[in-house]
């Protein structure tokens, strides 16, 4: 690299500046690796007419529309190339379920159990959920766009290439979770718990509101904006036991 030149590697979002091979300081700023967004392309679907969900059920290429699955047990079920639209999932049991290459639009429910489930290449659009249980779950290439999710339990979950976009998350619990290449874009994050979480290439700069209730010390693997740093300053000072006073 020649004197005063700069190079950008778009795959890793890194900016490198330096003076080349003739000495002097080389300054490297690694911003953040971008999340790979889910891009689901569904085949032609067949309407679901099977009645209730069943444990370990196998659902492939189906459309579930305006159905009430409240209280039903679909533990261990597999959903592949499916669309769930405007379905009720109140206390629906989907523990260990696998949701693959699917689109969930306008789903709603309280206490939906997706503990230790796998969501891969999934779009979750305009969901209205409360107390959804995804502890120990694996989320890979998942897009959460729009909607509101209260008290989301992601304790000890693994998130990789996940994007939260234009949604509201109230008191999400990421305790002990691993977040890698996760982005928050125009997303409201209220009262987040990051206790014992591991963050790698987590981009919080696009969050419309950023409120971390616990686990501020786990933000070392995240990127925030200058404005967000100022907003977090009082909480950071309190966390460090730092007193701030005028002269």
Regions found by a protein language model. Name each.
Residues 1-24:
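N-terminal amphipathic/basic-hydrophobic helices that include classical n-h-c signal peptides
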Residues 26-247:
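Tandem repeat scaffolds
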């Amino acid at each position: 690299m020649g004197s005063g030149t700069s190079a950008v590697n778009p795959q890793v979002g890194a900016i490198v500046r330096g003076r080349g091979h003739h000495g002097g300081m080389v300054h490297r700023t690694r911003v953040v690796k971008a999340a790979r967004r889910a891009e689901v392309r569904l085949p032609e679907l067949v309407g679901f007419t099977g009645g209730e969900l069943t444990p370990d059920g196998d659902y492939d290429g189906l459309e579930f529309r305006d159905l009430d699955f409240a209280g039903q047990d679909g533990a261990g079920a597999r959903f592949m190339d499916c669309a769930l639209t405007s379905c009720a999932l109140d206390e629906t049991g989907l523990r260990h379920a696998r949701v693959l290459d699917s689109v969930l639009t306008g789903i709603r429910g309280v206490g939906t159990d997706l503990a230790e489930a796998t969501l891969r290449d999934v779009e979750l659009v305009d969901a209205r959920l409360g107390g959804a249980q995804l502890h120990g779950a694996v989320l890979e290439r998942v897009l959460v766009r729009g909607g509101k999710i209260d008290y989301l339990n992601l304790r000890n979950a693994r998130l990789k290439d996940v994007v939260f976009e234009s949604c509201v998350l109230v008191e999400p619990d990421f305790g002990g979770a691993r977040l890698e290449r996760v982005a928050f874009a125009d997303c409201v994050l209220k009262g987040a718990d990051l206790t014992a979480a591991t963050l790698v290439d987590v981009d919080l700069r696009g969050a419309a509101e950023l409120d971390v209730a616990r686990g501020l010390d786990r933000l070392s693997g995240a990127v925030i904006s200058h404005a967000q740093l100022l907003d977090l300053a009082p909480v950071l000072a309190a966390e460090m036991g730092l007193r701030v006073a005028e002269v």
